[in-house]
Amino acid sequence: MILLVSPKDVAEAHEAIEGGADIIDVKNPPEGSLGANFPWVIKETREATPEGMLVSAAIGDVPYKPGTVTLAALGAAISGADYIKVGLYGTRSYQEALDVMKNVTKAVKDSGENKIVVAAGYADAYRVGGVDPLIIPRVARDAGCDVAMLDTAVKDGKTLFDHMSIELLKEFVEETHKYGMKCALAGSIKIEEIPMLKEINCDIVGVRGAACTKGDRNEGRIQKDLVKEIVKVCRQ
């Protein structure tokens, strides 16, 4: 299982790289779960990241505005992101989610056929009126995405496992794999919860808080020693 770590600036990206993270995922925590950072931060992070190491960028907890979201996705791709992550926050149905992701995929793949598109839903979608997380694999498949992902929308200390049972998460992973895509799971995941994700054959685990001082995604800073500990668990 590979590790995605989400820095908010280049200094944190260096810590994540030195700690052994596999994917450097640029985000902006004050703007939400999948908060979008600025194009120059993505560009600077890409320049600071070793060649051959993948850079991801979240483009926000997005509304149902396909044109707006597609432009943001293209901006992230052009700024140097290899993975473009879209948080389907404001989509209320399969059709709305598909509409957003289909257009994003078209724009991103037109900019570079090796770019990777991630459709992200929320395990706690019921708290924010979002689309059912269990339809995300189907949305991702039908839109031509590469990865189906789950995160949590509300960052209040509750983790992915507080909102979905391990059985449901396993179902999500298996359906994603059945469609020939990779599966990524995140959501205030603690280091001791990572082995459970390995057991259900998750491909990518995403963290920020667990790699930050005081375990705080907002006030803390990513530290390479904490990243090293998480890498060790992922590799066991």
Curated annotation (Swiss-Prot):
The job of this chain, per UniProt, is described as: Catalyzes the formation of 4-(hydroxymethyl)-2-furancarboxaldehyde phosphate (4-HFC-P) from two molecules of glyceraldehyde-3-P (GA-3-P).
User: Quick one: which pathway?
Assistant: Cofactor biosynthesis; methanofuran biosynthesis
Question: Which catalytic residues are annotated?
Answer: K27 (schiff-base intermediate with substrate), K85 (proton acceptor)
Assigned protein family: Belongs to the MfnB family.
Query: What is the protein's name according to its record?
Result: (5-formylfuran-3-yl)methyl phosphate synthase
Q: Which domain of life is it from?
A: Archaea
Question: What are the disulphide bonds in this sequence?
Answer: none
Enumerate the InterPro entries for this protein: 4HFCP_synth, 4HFCP_synth_arc
Pfam families named in the record? 4HFCP_synth
Q: Keywords assigned by UniProt?
A: Lyase, Schiff base
Q: Which organism is it from?
A: Methanococcus maripaludis (strain C7 / ATCC BAA-1331)
Gene Ontology MF annotations: carbon-carbon lyase activity
User: Is this entry keyworded Lyase?
Assistant: yes
Cite the EC number. 4.2.3.153
What is this enzyme's catalytic activity, as reactions? 2 D-glyceraldehyde 3-phosphate = 4-(hydroxymethyl)-2-furancarboxaldehyde phosphate + phosphate + 2 H2O
Q: Name one GO biological process term.
A: methanofuran biosynthetic process
Q: Specify the enzyme's EC class, one word.
A: lyase
Q: Which HAMAP family match?
A: MfnB (MF_00681)
What the entry lists under SUPFAM superfamilies is as follows: Aldolase, FMN-linked oxidoreductases
Does Magnesium count among this protein's keywords?
no
